[in-house]
Amino acid sequence: MLGSHNLRNYDPTLLLYTFGAMFSAFASAYRYTVWLQRPPTRVYWRRGWQLAFRRPEVRRTLLTLAGALGGNFVAQNFIRRRGWSRWVAHLCMSWGTLLAGAVALPLVFGWIHFESEANAPQVYQVLVFGVRIGAFHTESSWLRYMFFNLLNLSAVLVIIGVGLTLHRRLKEAGVIAVQQFGNDLVPLLLLLAVSATGLMLTVSMHALHGEGYVVISLIHAVTVIAMLLYVPFGKLFHIFQRPLHLGVTLYKQANAAAPPAVCSLCGEGFAGAMHVEDLKGVLAEVGLDWRLRGPVAHYMHVCPRCRRRQVGIWHGQAMMGQAKSTGD
């Protein structure tokens, strides 16, 4: 009811989409809450907010967040490092999906709608939450073309991305060996089905004069609802997890700038002190007690090189003890 003027701007024919979207939203929120309760995730979440609001370094924090937002979310450079085809595929799928959601969800709930002007029926008003933000002519306006084809554009982007990804998943032996049908292929097939049936609606309306429109619209509704129901339980859920990487970026930056933790054996720095202390807390929360007897209080106070050396020493001592007992 919020933003739709007590459902005055709501289209009852979209009821199934509404229930699917609401279920997906509540299920995703529940899973996200459970996910945040995991000790490692909770540490990143808490530290991310703490670092974001550090008063002496607000400007630096904002610049870091802006860079991470542009590099990891807009340009998605973390995928480009794995190959250009994967980068293009992920870029098309992610932006196509986000664009479709940004357009479809407000339309479903009545937050955005169009009305003809009273004195000029050929002019459409664009209303967001009941507030007029613009207007365009229905016959000769590039705004009309843009507004009415945003979902088609998003469908084309998603189909390109899904096609490239399916080609990789069906051709590369290394990918085939580790992929799972439910986790890797089902989301791609759902995205493809939603996008293809959405484009078929446009083809039916403009090229076939409405032939088969009702059947295609029902199939499209089924595919959309199936995808919405899949989101909280499958791979598409990482859409909501990915923004936490902004906090991880701040965490890595803070660890790199702070003095490192010092190894209790060799005296050299090896990792961020904050990271070591947080890791000790996480290990304790999950029931792993890595405290040691002797000069070293905790296993996490030992650098990786000394850990490998200690393992060799312990193995040697164990073998010598076994040989001695055998000789006796």
Feature-to-residue mapping (PLM):
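A generic "cationic amphipathic patch" detector
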Residues: 176, 253, 276-279, 316-319
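Short cysteine/histidine-rich metal-coordination sites, predominantly Zn2+-binding motifs
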Residues: 247, 278-289, 319-328
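Cysteine-rich micro-motifs
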Residues: 291-309
